[in-house]
Every structure is written in structure tokens, then in C-alpha cells.
Amino acid sequence: MRGNKEKDITQKTLEMYNDVFADIINVLLFNGEKVVTEDSLTDVLQESILKMDGRIRAQYRDIAKYWHNSKIKLSMFGLENQTKPEKLMPLRVFGYDGAEYVQQAKKENSKETKYPVITLVLYFGYNCRWNQPKSLFELLDIDERIKPYVNDFKMNLFEIAYLDREKIDMFKSDFWILADYLYQMRVNKDYVAGDTVIKHVDELLMLMTAMTRDYRFEKTINEVKGKEHVTMCEVLDRVEARGIEKGREEGIKEGTVNVLISLVKDGILSIADAAKRANMSEENFIQYIK
């Protein structure tokens, strides 16, 4: 079944590349300055273990990487992808970050340098802004008498389609193509592709498939496989050509079916013969007659 799970998987695949991950961090946290380099990142086991009700349970981040300076961990960065607003997102992120701090507090890690955990929530919606809680205080029902003693937790939320154009153009990796697409769809309700060369072709086209629900992007992967200097402009030309061809084939089929229906109504062909010539079941052919 294709759906949100597919989107999640494809987003993870693109962002797992260090050049894409570092690009996202540098633009969103450091205003485009190249602070985090590709070779300073290492993958984190995306599963955090919690013990609840006497049972061991696993939580899964979308993607996370350690940022190193030599052998010292400077930070752990996590990315959480959202295609629609989610009410409980502050709790989820709080749980992920908390689990990493608990890990650092374990006895076997007592002598290790302690590092901060930073999670970025990337919202990919372009039809509406994020309209759900962004912090624990917005989510929790807190008695005012105890509120001064409750620690708030605010998400680092980035609404990609709503970033300034200047910020969008700071991205240097394939993530720019996604950000540009989301921005254009929000502002113009349409997308005009540029001539930027795609580095991770398969992953980006799978992501575009999941985001747009247009499976012609996925089918185009084999057509461009092995080619150098593939751009979104070329990809869209191929996608459009597929659409035209599909329309032509459907038009021919519709014309053929209409002729067969006339022959059936004139008593020249039986429904069984007409259905056979149309390469469909009798039940489906009868639906056309109705």
C-alpha cells in the first residue's frame, strides 16, 4: 500500500546522504554558512529504547547523525519529516531527544563528553501553514498554579514551502529542488522546473513520486538511469511525454470501445465477442454500455 509510509521512506533515503543532510543543517541553522561538512557526520542508530510498563519499547526517529570534531561529538542532529500538521509532534520530539539524553546518562557513558541533541521538524505542506502545537505548553492542559514549575519544550519547526525565496536558494544539494518545488506550488500553484543537475536521481524522483502521487516520476527512473547531467527539466519533459502517450492510448481505446458498443446495439456482435475484442471482461464491457 502506497501512502504516508512511502513518503517517509523516500524522504529518509534522500536525507540520509551526508551532502543533503549537511546542506539542510547549514541553511536552516547557520544561514547557509558551511559549518557542518559531509565528512564530519556519522549515522546514528535510529532506534531509541524505552522501558514502559515493564516492557521494552522502541522509538524510531526519521533520521539522525552525529556531528564530530575529530573524535569528539559536538552534537546529535535529528530530522523529522511531516507532510501534514500533527498535534502530538512536540511530545514525539521530546521523547526522541529525551531518550538520547538518557543514553548519555547511563553508567557506561559517564566519562564520555556530553553533547546537545537538536531535532529539526521539516514540514513539507504547501496548502496550509502548520496549525498544530509547536511546544509542550501549547499541548498540555496545565493548572496555572503549577505552570511556573513545568518545563516547556519548543520544537524547531521549519515550514519549507514558507521559507523566504532567498533562504530557499541557499540550498546547494538536491534538497533545493524539493524546496523550490514546494515554494513554487505554494506561491504559483504550478511548478516550472529549472536546469539544476540532479545528483541523487533515483532518490529524488522517488521522493517526487511520493509527494505528488504522480507515478510517472518513478517510471522515469529507468529511462534516465546511467545518464549524466539529468535535470528536472528533462525529467518533466519525459513525464509530460508519458502523459501525452497515455492520453493517446486511452483515446484510441475509448474510440474502439464506442465502435464495439454500436455493433452490439445493432445486433452485429454479442457482448462476449465485443468484450473479447476490447480485451476486457464481459462485466466491465457492460459497464461501458450503461
Give the ranges of each region predicted by the language model.
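Elongated, amphipathic alpha-helical interaction scaffolds
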Residues: 1-290
